């Protein structure tokens, strides 16, 4: 989690954006995030848009994939069938 927080700070995310970003990574919907943070869904959508803009990533899937990429690197030997 520290590595993720450092990356959020590197991107210049505000504290609120960091909280939303972490919930996005955990797979919560905008509606669920709004309920958890006791705010409007529109606010969460705006924060998500700011997160994607600051990170230079295009949407939720690319945002999540950015963090998963290091874990999903497959050795060529592991990728061969059977």
Q: Where are these predicted regions, by residue range?
A:
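Helix-turn-helix DNA-binding segment
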Residues: 3-43, 69-71, 75-78
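Positions in alpha-helical segments
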Residues: 6, 49-50
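Hydrophobic residues on short alpha-helical segments
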Residues: 21-25, 52, 64
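Basic, Lys/Arg-enriched C-terminal extension of HTH/homeodomain DNA-binding domains
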Residues: 53-82
């Amino acid at each position: 989690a520290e590595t993720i927080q450092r990356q959020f700070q590197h991107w210049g995310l505000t504290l609120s954006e960091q909280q939303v970003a972490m919930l996005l990574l955990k797979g919560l919907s905008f509606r669920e995030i709004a309920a958890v943070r006791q705010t409007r869904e529109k606010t969460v959508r705006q924060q998500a848009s700011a997160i994607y803009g600051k990170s230079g990533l295009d949407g939720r899937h690319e945002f999540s994939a950015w963090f998963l990429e290091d874990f999903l690197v497959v050795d060529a030997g592991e990728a061969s069938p059977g």
